[in-house]
């Protein structure tokens, strides 16, 4: 099976919905106290805005003409921050691969393309957030070489 990693086009907005549903279900199952049961999709307007914004990156993974994965990311510019030096960070919002296509290297290809893009944009690092219940994602990102930098804590009232 040949995997093609490419930049998204407008038609992909509808084609990624099954993947967004998988992510929404995963988050709801892991934290039903925080996440709604219904998936929230990008509107076509929001998707179009991200496609046109040079700071945003939307990558698509295709296998045999089917969208089987995607990555959403954008550049965060830290300037004149109270504690950080000035730098650009490539923030990965989502990397998602259909359940039926996991463990085939597709996520790794998306991650590697994110790295290439981050380097081209002269970013210092890549950053992301992952919920502690999402053990598969944590293992995947660690396998890709990411390390834990901070830990966000919560106290439920």
What are these regions (language model features)?
Residues 97, 103-116, 143:
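Conserved acetyl-CoA-binding loop-helix of GNAT-fold acetyltransferases
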Residues 24-47:
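Conserved GNAT-fold acetyl-CoA-binding loop/helix
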Residues 45-59, 91:
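A short helix-loop-beta-strand connector motif used in the catalytic cores of GNAT acetyltransferases and
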Residues 65, 141, 146:
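Conserved active-site tyrosine of GNAT-family acetyltransferases
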Residues 60, 66-75, 91, 96:
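Conserved beta-strand in the GNAT
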Residues 4-18, 27:
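A short beta-loop-alpha structural element at the N-terminal edge
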Residues 127-137, 154-157:
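Conserved beta-strand-loop-alpha-helix junction that forms the acyl-donor binding cleft
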Residues 118-129:
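Conserved GNAT acetyl-CoA-binding A-motif
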């Amino acid at each position: 099976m040949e995997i093609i990693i490419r930049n998204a086009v407008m038609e992909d907005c509808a084609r990624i919905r099954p993947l967004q549903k998988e992510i929404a279900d995963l988050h709801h199952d892991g934290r039903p106290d925080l996440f709604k049961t219904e998936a929230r999709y990008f509107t076509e307007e929001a998707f179009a805005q991200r496609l046109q914004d040079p700071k945003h990156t939307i990558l698509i993974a295709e296998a045999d003409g089917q969208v089987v994965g995607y990555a959403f990311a954008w550049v965060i510019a830290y300037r004149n921050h109270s504690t950080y030096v000035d730098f650009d960070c490539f923030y990965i919002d989502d990397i998602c691969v259909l359940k039926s296509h996991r463990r085939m290297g597709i996520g790794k290809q998306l991650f590697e393309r994110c790295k290439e893009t981050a380097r081209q944009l002269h970013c210092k690092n890549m950053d992301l957030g992952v919920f502690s219940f999402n053990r598969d994602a944590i293992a995947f990102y660690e396998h890709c070489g990411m390390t834990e930098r901070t830990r966000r804590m919560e106290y439920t009232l």
